[in-house]
Amino acid sequence: MEDNTPRQRDPISLTSVANGLENMGAELLESLEEGRAPGSDSSPAEVGGGWSKAGPEHLGRRSLQPALRVRRFCREHTQLFRWICTGLLCTAFAAFLLIACLLDFQRALALFVLFCVVLFFLAHSLLKRLLGPKLLRCVKPLRHPCLNLWFKRGLALAAFLGLVLWLVLDTAQRPEQLVSFGGICVFILLLFAGSKHHRAVSWRAVSWGLGLQFALGLFVIRTEPGFIAFQWLGDQIQIFLSYTEAGSSFVFGEALVKDVFAFQVLPIIVFFSCAMSVLYYVGLMQWVILKISWLMQATMGTTATETLSVAGNIFVSQTEAPLLIRPYLADMTLSEIHVVMTGGYATIAGSLLGAYISFGIDAASLIAASVMAAPCALALSKLVYPEVEESKFKREEGVKLTYGDAQNLLEAASSGAAMSVRVVTNIAANLIAFLAVLAFINAALSWLGDMVDVQGLSFQLICSYVLRPVAFLMGVAWEDCPVVAELLGMKLFLNEFVAYQELSGYKQRRLAGAEEWVGSRKQWISVRAEILTTYALCGFANFSSIGIMLGGLTSMVPQRKGDFSQIVLRALCTGACVSLVNACVAGILYVPRGAEVDCVSFLNTTLSSSSFEVYQCCRQFFQSTSLEFSPEALDNCCRFYNHTICV
């Protein structure tokens, strides 16, 4: 008799999945290797050993013995395999580098230099690990207080005499450099006059910070290897950023990317932010930040947290750098908080660096300005707000940098691109708002000026008069001071993005060989003025950044909102002065290069189209009574420009 009772289905068990047994083959290998039954936590001894003697299981175990041995061998010699793979990769790279150098050393020079730099730091790390304690024991007898004091005094005296000798010999050829030196003195005296605690100023931090800034500027601007290296680095960044066009053209179309500012410049920020996030994930950014902060902390005597924040500001923005030291913000002193704010105002973010380079701003000057601003920000911050409290972070052992939350390289790249969307929309919104406000202010000022017969009254005109002494103290020629003062006003009262965009317009007109004056309006400024302005604009020190800074820090440490509000204006003024002092240092060190030096050779060999160099040399040619130019140079100059000598 058949049973018509409905049969109940056996329930589906998810035990194996819950226990992590999705891969049954891997589980079988593990169970056989450990000597237990598959799917069981018991060993053969516990279950009587019956399963191991069974036919199919026993045969399966014997057939898997080679795989088990290979797996066990690999597990026991993991470190050896890593060393072998590393050795093979290094050997392959060395062979590749050798072949590249033999074929064309000039073409492989950049790769060779990078290889030497990496090799130097690896050797330094190895020697520090092996010989560091021994060297410290050898140097310890030299740390006698009296000997240490005389060493510091001798070093300070040598630095002072070297600076005086430098100024005497170098400024004899270019007296305008003395104006820039006077500007540094004026800005430092003004900051010292507004210092919170005059008697507590650490002159060690101030002098070492300015000294490091000057040394970096000397290497980048004056020495040939430094100048070539930073020019090469700037060129490589420009080439790297040009790949943005592939992605933006696909999304927006080639016509929009070429003709519309938002689709041409803003995608660069997305791409650069993605690259920075990847570098942060692999740990390269943290390594560079730690090395820079170690140098500043060892020389200037600052604390670990404030130094890390300022070093991080070279690469990230004013709200991202404090994230490096977020766990320590609640316990930092007011002086350390002031340093954090000043560092944020004195530098620009790495992602925005790409946008400014896309404007045509000199990449080497932007990179140098960002690096030089770090020690200067520490120095001037300690001048304005000296330390009078006991810091908890005098040593760097207790301070650690995080490596982010990304689990893999793709997630790091994706999160970097996603985070940049907020930056891009913020920039676009600010540009729309600020340019609209500027147009309204100019219209209102023009309306008010017409009532008293003052024609052309505008915000830029007011800034050109009010800030003209500041531009002159930077070392800018007096005829270029009105334009530079306008740009400084835009940076301070609007933002640096608008100012750099305006500066790029002046540079493009200069490179196109346009006339210098159209009526009473200057169409471009000299190369020296452009370089100094690039340094002076490199920073977030503007009134619109106050809210950004307060909002970012308050979200991390809400209980210290009162402390942040108390010192934010002082930090803003200090950050603005850091950029100005940076420009003054560049003014002391700047020397003309290229056609600006030898116009005779330039005009006698190269003159095919109008450019700034052609304009400058032709103007010098028209005004000269002693220089010898070829008749062809005269004909070419007269073809581009009108002069009485051409008749």
Swiss-Prot record:
Its main location: membrane. The chain crosses the membrane at residues 80-103, 109-127, 147-166, 178-194, 201-221, 261-282, 294-317, 337-359, 366-385, 423-445, 457-478, 534-557, 569-591. Keywords: Cell membrane, Glycoprotein, Membrane, Symport, Transmembrane, Transmembrane helix, Transport. It is found in: Cell membrane; Apical cell membrane. One of its GO terms (molecular function) is pyrimidine- and adenosine-specific:sodium symporter activity. GO terms for cellular component: apical plasma membrane; plasma membrane. The keyword Transport applies. Residues 104-108, 167-177, 222-260, 318-336, 386-422, 479-533, 592-647 are extracellular. Due to its high apparent affinity but slow transport, adenosine could act as a negative regulator of pyrimidine transport under some conditions. GO terms for biological process: cytidine transport; nucleoside import across plasma membrane; pyrimidine nucleobase transport; uridine transmembrane transport. Glycans are attached at N604, N642. It comes from the Eukaryota. Sodium and pyrimidine nucleoside symporter of the plasma membrane that imports uridine, thymidine and cytidine into cells by coupling their transport to the transmembrane sodium electrochemical gradient. Also transports adenosine, an atypical substrate transported with high apparent affinity, but low maximum velocity. Therefore, exhibits the transport characteristics of the nucleoside transport system cit or N2 subtype (N2/cit). Involved in renal nucleoside (re)absorption. Belongs to the concentrative nucleoside transporter (CNT) (TC 2.A.41) family. This is Sodium/nucleoside cotransporter 1. It comes from Sus scrofa.
